[in-house]
Amino acid sequence: MCKAEKFLYHRKLWEMKVKFLGDSKIDKLKNSLVLRSRMSLWMIRAMTILLLWSCFVHLVAVGEMWGPRLLKGWPSCFNHHDFPIAAEMTSLPMKIALPPKRIYQNNGYLMVSCNGGLNQMRAAICDMVTIARYMNVTLIVPELDKTSFWNDPSEFKDIFDVDHFISSLRDEVRILKELPPRLKRRVRLGLYHTMPPISWSNMSYYQDQILPLVKKYKVVHLNKTDTRLANNELPVEIQKLRCRANFNGLRFTPKIEELGRRVVKILREKGPFLVLHLRYEMDMLAFSGCSHGCNRYEEEELTRMRYAYPWWKEKVIDSELKRKEGLCPLTPEETALTLSALGIDRNVQIYIAAGEIYGGKRRLKALTDVFPNVVRKETLLDSSDLSFCKNHSSQMAALDYLISLESDIFVPTYYGNMAKVVEGHRRFLGFKKTIELNRKLLVKLIDEYYEGLLSWEVFSTTVKAFHATRMGGPKRRLVIPNKPKEEDYFYANPYECLQLLHENNGNSLEET
């Protein structure tokens, strides 16, 4: 049952209780008036108001236990007729009690500089919250990456609700917006320690290696944060804190959330919609060396770009070999064929959650010819609506993130950071359908279909059969000891945090 349905159910139940209790009280009071003429009308009104108020307070308390909501006032699953309810819920101001502050002996201060795109940084922030809590240190609001390919100058407060971040986690860890003045002076004088922590580390590494440095220098700066905490073999309470930071602590700014609500409302007014994370931007193709379907000029342009960034270590890449291994994003042509084979209705709205597609309309034509209702945020909103996040790729990505969470189906064409983090968040919201494409299988089938070795019926049936169990449902993570890059990513499937959802759905975790 989605949250909107729960809201209606509880509201009807509440009204029934009020009616029953109200009638009972009034009947008794009327009898009392007959027997005792001294009872006055104002007492009836006072008791009725008191009763209604107590019921309302109870309802609010129950409402706060329903779990996280994606956007303020939104249900976690949608029908297009739900919006009057959503509006009514939004109009009810609720004062949420803050958790009590956790009192602990502070061992020092942890500064972190996140690297990568929005979703890589999002996961890293959750890891840093957990690490700071475990070491009993004070976390300084993380610094976001401003020097990578995206060159986005956004600060933490430009993307996330920083006050909510601090207050919602204060019963676990102390978070400050900046260092105290005396420690700022130490940092200016260089009296602190900076380092990149080892990737995929467990908690004993932070306890034995990092904590002594914090105690010695008072301030430690971690200048790399991507995948610095292991996927597995961590205590359950550690994993659950990672989830709490991700699903409750990190909330986008009101401006981004409001814009997200507007886009989803526009889409919902026309029916269901699918979000396609078409990872076919120039930077992705240049970095990965994937140029299938590109012309000679485009291949040379992508190669030049790859050599222009020295921190992109791999330079000589066999594009076709990489594609056959399933390591390339699907092209727009391959994507159109795959969606058709999966049985996606050609009239469904497809929202493209991505930057500028390489090759523009020429490459998108293969997709729009089959699925004519392809839209983007730029086509749904006026340019003035997006002006505040223009040239801020992380803020644009935050908007796409929100819309991806609320879609009926989410389909990423490449299994990058956004695909993984959104998949895990959609699992948390009730195992919402996310199609994890098997690219290695798909390119093999697509090539055989183009070569005439497979009929459409066989091609489509095979694609559907192999993806029937790749829809974002309950399952355990694949664990590969000593090979963290090859095993399932924690944030794509945080199953330690989903046990209640499994039980409510009558499902058990399947071994993979």
Curated annotation (Swiss-Prot):
Catalytic activity field: alpha-D-galacturonosyl-[(1->2)-alpha-L-rhamnosyl-(1->4)-alpha-D-galacturonosyl](n) + UDP-beta-L-rhamnose = [(1->2)-alpha-L-rhamnosyl-(1->4)-alpha-D-galacturonosyl](n+1) + UDP + H(+)
Pathway assigned to this chain's UniProt record: Glycan metabolism; pectin biosynthesis
Pfam families per the UniProt record, alphabetical: O-FucT
Biological process annotations from GO: cell wall organization; fucose metabolic process; pectin biosynthetic process
GO cellular component term of the entry, any: Golgi membrane
Keyword field contains Glycosyltransferase: yes
Binding-site positions, substrate: 277-279
Membrane topology value: Single-pass type II membrane protein
InterPro entries from the UniProt entry: FucosylTrfase_pln (IPR024709), GDP-Fuc_O-FucTrfase (IPR019378)
Entry keywords, A to Z: Carbohydrate metabolism, Cell wall biogenesis/degradation, Fucose metabolism, Glycoprotein, Glycosyltransferase, Golgi apparatus, Membrane, Signal-anchor, Transferase, Transmembrane, Transmembrane helix
Segments passing through the bilayer: 41-63
Function noted in UniProt: Glycosyltransferase involved in the formation of rhamnogalacturonan I (RG-I) oligosaccharides in the seed coat mucilage, which is a specialized cell wall with abundant RG-I. Transfers the rhamnose residue from UDP-beta-L-rhamnose to RG-I oligosaccharides.
Similarity comment text for this entry: Belongs to the glycosyltransferase GT106 family.
The protein's name in its UniProt record: Rhamnogalacturonan I rhamnosyltransferase 1
Species this chain originates from: Arabidopsis thaliana (Mouse-ear cress)
Gene it is expressed from: RRT2
